[in-house]
């Protein structure tokens, strides 16, 4: 009605619609959801090229990583994303240009498929500006040349386009004709995780033992969720205590069997506190890490449950972790948690060490 559209500068939008109601965004939450969506894509194919916080190319070419139909894969991705409480639009095509344009055709939650051999019929009637890289200035120059649609651009004279736009000119012709050759370039994969750990730095030193123990269990819960997300179970727990900017100590314990249950390894970390701390010592930072990984699917089941780990209690703990993980994934990290976590929700900074050298 007022001419306001997405990606428009807010100053311009305010001029067009001065009576609009403005709300503040939550970039941290936006970034969190972006990470989760990219994680969903990576469960379908290792070739995921993120190009912005809310956009990515991914390769599901039949036979490359799966024999399943790309359309079926994309529908499953949309269903997974919808469980986060958001929507996504997907375009399917033989190259990036076609897929990108197709993704813009139907929103929200659109799925536009351009089958091989139909690219020119799909692209030809669209305005030249529908193709990425053609902004207002380029579109205006093309219009002066009598080129207003992608079909007209695909039939443009190669030499003339080169004289006006340089080497980019012939490339624009190829892209407009749907003949672009492009590859999805996945981000360089990190080395396989050697450890998963989290730390919390407190605004003020803490000296109370109960509060330190609660902090250890809180940080363990953060590491536990990351372990489950990665499908990992560790057998060595490490506790780190930092007293000030220059003094820190760590202690380790090997557990009877691999686990990703923070109630198990968090309790073990609490038992390590006596090796690093004595009453009255000020604590600035607490860290809990797990290493000695065994892939979750390769876990060997024990013939008998170890010692005091009652089978029913262990199963209930696993079920509780699974449910809380799902709730946090859908509604955010603050949706559910233990009462002890409330005291650490503010006045702390959270860090995630990347490896043993950081831990």
Feature locations, PLM:
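DNA-contacting surface of Y-family translesion DNA polymerases
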Residues: 130, 138-283, 295-298
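Gly/Gly-Pro- and Ser/Thr-rich, intrinsically disordered tail segments characteristic of DNA damage-repair
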Residues: 1-174, 187, 225, 311-359
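Preference for bulky hydrophobic residues occupying beta-strand positions
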Residues: 58, 90, 239-241, 253, ...
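Short Gly/Ser/Thr- and Asp/Glu-enriched loop/turn motifs at secondary-structure junctions
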Residues: 51-55, 93-96, 232-236, 281-285
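Short glycine-enriched loops at secondary-structure junctions
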Residues: 94-96, 178, 291
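Acidic, metal-coordinating catalytic segment for phosphate/diphosphate chemistry
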Residues: 257-359
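Short, hydrophobic beta-strand segments
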Residues: 56-62, 250-253, 302-307
């Amino acid at each position: 009605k007022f001419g306001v559209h997405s990606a428009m500068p807010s100053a311009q939008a305010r001029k067009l619609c001065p009576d609009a109601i403005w709300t503040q965004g939550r970039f941290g939450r936006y970034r969190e959801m972006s990470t989760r969506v990219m994680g969903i894509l990576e469960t379908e194919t290792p070739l995921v090229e993120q190009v912005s916080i809310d956009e990515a190319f991914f390769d599901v070419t039949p036979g490359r990583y799966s024999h399943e139909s790309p359309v079926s894969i994309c529908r499953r991705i949309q269903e997974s994303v919808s469980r986060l409480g958001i929507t996504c639009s997907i375009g399917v095509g033989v190259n990036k240009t076609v897929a990108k344009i197709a993704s813009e055709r139907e929103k929200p939650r659109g799925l536009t498929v351009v089958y091989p051999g139909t690219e020119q019929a799909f692209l030809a009637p669209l305005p030249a500006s529908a193709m990425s890289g053609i902004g207002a200035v380029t579109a205006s120059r093309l219009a002066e040349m009598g080129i207003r649609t992608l079909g007209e651009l695909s039939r443009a004279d190669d030499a003339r386009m080169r004289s006006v736009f340089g080497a980019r000119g012939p490339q624009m012709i190829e892209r407009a004709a749907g003949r672009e050759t492009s590859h999805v370039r996945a981000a360089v994969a990190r080395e396989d995780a050697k450890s998963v750990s989290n730390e919390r730095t407190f605004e003020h030193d803490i000296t109370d033992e109960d509060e330190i123990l609660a902090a250890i269990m809180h940080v363990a819960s953060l590491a536990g969720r990351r372990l489950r997300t990665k499908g990992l179970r560790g057998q060595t727990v490490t506790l780190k205590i930092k007293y000030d900017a220059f003094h820190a100590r760590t202690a380790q314990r090997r557990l009877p069997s691999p686990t990703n249950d923070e109630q198990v390894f968090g309790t073990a970390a609490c038992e390590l506190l006596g090796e690093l701390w004595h009453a009255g010592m000020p604590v600035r930072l607490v860290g809990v890490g797990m290493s000695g990984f065994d892939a979750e699917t390769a876990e060997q089941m024990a013939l008998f449950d170890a010692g005091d780990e009652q089978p029913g209690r262990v199963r209930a703990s696993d079920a509780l972790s699974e449910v809380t993980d799902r709730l946090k994934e859908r509604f955010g990290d603050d949706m559910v948690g233990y009462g002890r976590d409330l005291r650490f929700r503010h006045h702390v900074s959270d860090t995630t060490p990347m490896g043993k050298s950081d831990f």
